[in-house]
């Protein structure tokens, strides 16, 4: 299935990242996490990756696999549902609740890395921070995203960014992952 077929756009779309690009980018982010957190060192922190549904969960799973493969350290990973913490509940159609899954050991005193596919206004991340507060008390919270498209409405930034993509507000960025869309890729559409 072609990447542009899943955008829901009027056909004006172009590929930003191929499947190979997505794979390399996830691998690079995994290496950056290992290096920045000293995860594979003798006093490395306990790291937990929490994906923001839907594609953030899949990215967190892939990052956890890569980190384990590259460092020999297994990291906990799960999902953090932000639905009830969103500030746009009344403006959008109802959404089903997703499952929140926290790995054994919880998140207290851990280095938690929130994982999302696209960083845009920052509102999803703010919702995730609110949800996280109800789950536990991490020592440090960081953010990893596959694509940062700018246009922040809140003073947030990602610690790990796969690709910075300057966009206009009229454009949409769609991350496609094989587990959901049949193939990996990133497309931009008007």
Curated annotation (Swiss-Prot):
Motif (PRPP-binding): 112-124
Superkingdom of source: Bacteria
One GO-annotated biological process of the protein: regulation of DNA-templated transcription
Gene Ontology MF terms: uracil phosphoribosyltransferase activity
Keywords recorded for this protein, A-Z: Glycosyltransferase, Transcription, Transcription regulation, Transferase
Catalytic reactions of this protein: UMP + diphosphate = 5-phospho-alpha-D-ribose 1-diphosphate + uracil
Keyword Transport attached: no
Stored CDD domains: PRTases_typeI
PANTHER family (alphabetical): BIFUNCTIONAL PROTEIN PYRR
HAMAP family in the record: PyrR
Designated name of the protein: Bifunctional protein PyrR
């Amino acid at each position: 299935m072609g990447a542009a077929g899943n955008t829901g756009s009027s056909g004006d779309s172009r590929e930003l990242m191929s499947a190979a690009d997505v794979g390399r980018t996830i691998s690079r982010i995994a290496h950056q996490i290992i290096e920045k957190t000293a995860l594979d060192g003798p006093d490395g922190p306990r790291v937990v990756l929490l994906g923001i549904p839907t594609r953030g969960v899949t990215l967190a799973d892939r990052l956890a696999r890569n980190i384990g493969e590259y460092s020999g350290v297994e990291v906990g990973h799960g999902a953090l549902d932000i639905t009830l913490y969103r500030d746009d509940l009344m403006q959008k159609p109802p959404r089903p609740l997703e499952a929140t899954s926290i790995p054994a050991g919880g998140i207290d005193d851990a280095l938690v890395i929130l994982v999302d596919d696209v960083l845009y206004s920052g509102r999803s991340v703010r919702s995730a921070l609110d949800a996280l507060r109800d789950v536990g008390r991490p020592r440090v919270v960081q953010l990893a995203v596959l694509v940062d498209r700018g246009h922040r409405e809140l003073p947030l930034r990602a610690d790990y960014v796969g690709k910075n993509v300057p966009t206009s507000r009229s454009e949409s960025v769609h991350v496609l992952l094989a587990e959901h869309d049949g193939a990996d890729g990133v497309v931009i559409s008007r």
